[in-house]
Regions:
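Adenine-nucleotide phosphate-binding core of ATP-dependent small-molecule kinases
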Residues: 81-106, 218-219
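A short acidic Gly-Thr/Ser loop motif
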Residues: 6-13, 169-184, 189-191
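Short acidic, glycine/serine/threonine-rich loops at helix termini
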Residues: 133-137, 160-164, 186-189
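Early-domain small/polar-rich strand-loop-helix modules and first-structured segments
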Residues: 1-79, 141, 147-156, 192-196, ...
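Short beta-strand-loop/turn "lid" adjacent to the catalytic site in phosphate-handling enzymes
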Residues: 74-77, 85, 113-138
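Phosphate/pyrophosphate-binding loops at sites that engage ATP/ADP/AMP, CoA/4′-phosphopantetheine
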Residues: 43, 100-119, 219
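Conserved phosphate-binding catalytic cores of ATP/NTP-utilizing and phosphoryl-transfer enzymes
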Residues: 1-2, 147-178
């Protein structure tokens, strides 16, 4: 079976899905694998890493140093200090994605009961592929997938809409994202008076209350 893997990553978690050609995407019910907190914990004294909820659990138990908000930090900084060592954030994001992707593929294979081949992977997020391309290439370098592409949320929304029934194209569309400390609204309009049809996506951000990251032990 050939699959395309979707990987949406943000400040709080990475979320995986898959699709067969010509079929609707599937977000399987695989607790701890389909959606994983973007946190890593390095065990004290050894080069052993945990990710997601296990990372938080180990850090809370005093077994290691916690690195959280990995993806958003990586976009805006180069390094992070854990205990007495400094790490490249692209290296930590690469390690995190390698572990979580491998676990997801293994569980999907078990759930489907057959061998699968990953034909392509699409990574989406609040990113500008043109600006962040170098860092994005670094964080996927260890994934065993040849065809990897990057999309901003705006591009992802557009790609989804153009594959919907034509009758929906005449309406204004709004997508709401509430995964951070902001409510992000994507407002999509299509000008059918032009040829080709011109699509515009307006993004607005509304600040909400300061909410603590559920993986945080830093504050």
């Amino acid at each position: 079976m050939e699959l395309v893997i979707g990987c949406d990553i943000n400040e709080y978690y990475v979320q995986f899905s898959y699709a067969e050609e010509g079929k609707e995407p599937v977000m399987p019910d695989l607790p701890g694998v389909t959606q994983v907190e973007t946190a890593l914990c390095r065990r004290e004294g050894v080069n052993q890493w945990y990710e997601g909820k296990e990372a938080v659990k180990r850090a809370l138990a005093g077994e290691g140093a916690l690195a959280e908000h990995l993806f958003s930090r990586m976009l805006h900084a180069d390094t992070i200090r854990l205990s007495d060592s400094e790490y490249q954030l692209t290296d930590l994001c690469s390690l995190f994605l390698e572990h979580t992707y491998t676990a997801f593929i293994r569980k999907v294979r078990e759930q489907l009961g057959e061998e699968i081949t990953v034909r392509a992977l699409v990574l989406t997020g609040r990113i500008d592929p043109g600006v962040h391309y170098g860092k994005l290439q670094e964080i996927v370098k260890n994934l065993p997938v040849e065809d990897i592409s990057f999309q901003s949320h705006e591009e992802s929304i557009f790609s989804y809409l153009v594959h919907q029934p034509r009758r929906l194209m005449g309406y204004e569309t709004q997508v709401l994202d509430l995964t951070s400390e902001q409510l992000v609204t994507y407002r999509v309009e299509m000008n059918h008076k032009t040829r080709p049809v011109v699509v515009s996506i307006e993004t607005t951000e509304t600040d909400l209350y300061k909410k603590k990251h559920y993986a945080s032990i830093m504050e």
